[in-house]
């Protein structure tokens, strides 16, 4: 396994600048935020793509994931909070189609930068769109997306999160089975699993063949706030032993969007804390 860092901590930097900072610290991979102010809209023919490719080559970085979990760029004013609209489960067909088009663009971008996978979320159940209705909208959206992903040979990982339509590993596994695509899986955030007190060995065993990327951060007292590894309560020795047991071979991507005030420090502390786990052959 290899260690990556997400550019969503570097929202005061351009995407090429963020990749450079991550590369200079010694990470093997980088996750690209497909939202403002980075890869949005995620058009693979955009002028910035060549700059990104040059930075990846310069620092020998792979792309661990194209992160399409949020799409605040669709809205003219930032609220300062993550947004999941337009979502794939929205009651309005036109809104869903916006997100479907965006997701297909993520897939095209992944091809261009040699990423194996993208990540998305289910979205929330808004007023007038209860879960039993929203899930059908989500399934139909995913069927169209997965047809496109299969033709482009890109994996699609759904990231579940407390408060979303799909908010735990059991629900995600059921959704994967219903949609029926071999390229649909998980962008598994182990911090989220800690927040909702999931049994980690059971979770990893359930999803192991469908985990395309792992998000990692520390969590304190099961509160959903991403912390630098070592700053919370997660037992990383135990956690990495669980990951080792399923023979996971993908990226561990540190996700610390909560540190946009000092992303370089967050990335530096993270790699210093986590590197011994890799050097000691735990992973």
Residue ranges and their predicted role:
Residues 33-56, 122-129:
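Glycine-rich, proline-tolerant flexible connector loops at the mouths of alpha/beta enzymes
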Residues 31, 65-67, 119, 212-215, ...:
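Conserved beta-strand positions in the central sheet of alpha/beta enzyme cores
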Residues 34-35, 68-71, 122-123, 161, ...:
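Active-site loop/turn elements of alpha/beta-hydrolase fold enzymes
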Residues 1-4, 11-26, 37, 50-53, ...:
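Histidine-acidic metal/acid-base catalytic patches
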Residues 17, 58, 73-185:
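Active-site acidic/histidine proton-transfer and metal-coordination neighborhood
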Residues 32, 63-65, 158, 188, ...:
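Hydrophobic residues in well-ordered beta-strands that form the structural core
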Residues 64-76:
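Short, solvent-exposed beta-strand-terminating loops
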Residues 41, 45-48, 92-99, 131-134, ...:
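Residue-level preference for long, well-ordered alpha-helices that form the structural scaffold
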């Amino acid at each position: 396994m290899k260690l990556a860092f997400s550019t969503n901590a570097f929202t005061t930097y351009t995407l090429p600048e963020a990749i450079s900072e991550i590369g200079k610290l010694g990470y093997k991979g980088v996750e690209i935020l497909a939202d403002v102010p980075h890869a949005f809209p995620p058009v693979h023919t955009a002028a910035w793509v060549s700059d990104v490719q040059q930075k990846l080559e310069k620092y020998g970085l792979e792309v661990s994931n194209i992160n399409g979990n949020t799409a605040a760029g669709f809205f003219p004013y930032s609220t300062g909070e993550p947004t999941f609209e337009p979502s794939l489960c929205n009651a309005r067909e036109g809104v869903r189609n916006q997100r479907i088009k965006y997701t297909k663009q993520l897939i095209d971008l992944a091809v261009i930068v040699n990423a194996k996978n993208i990540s998305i979320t289910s979205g929330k159940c808004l007023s007038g769109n209860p879960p039993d209705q929203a899930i059908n909208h989500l399934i139909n959206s995913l069927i169209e997306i997965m047809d496109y992903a299969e033709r482009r040979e890109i994996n699609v990982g759904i990231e579940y999160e407390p408060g979303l339509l799909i908010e735990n590993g059991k629900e995600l596994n059921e959704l994967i089975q219903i949609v029926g695509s071999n390229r649909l899986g998980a962008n598994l955030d182990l911090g989220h699993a800690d927040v909702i007190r999931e049994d980690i060995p059971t979770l990893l065993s359930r999803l192991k063949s469908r985990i395309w990327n792992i998000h990692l951060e520390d969590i304190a007292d099961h509160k959903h706030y991403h912390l630098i590894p070592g700053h919370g309560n997660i037992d990383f020795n135990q956690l990495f032993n669980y990951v080792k047991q399923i023979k996971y071979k993908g990226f561990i991507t540190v996700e610390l969007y909560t540190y946009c005030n000092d992303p370089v420090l967050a990335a530096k502390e993270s790699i210093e804390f986590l590197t011994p786990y890799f050097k000691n052959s735990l992973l």
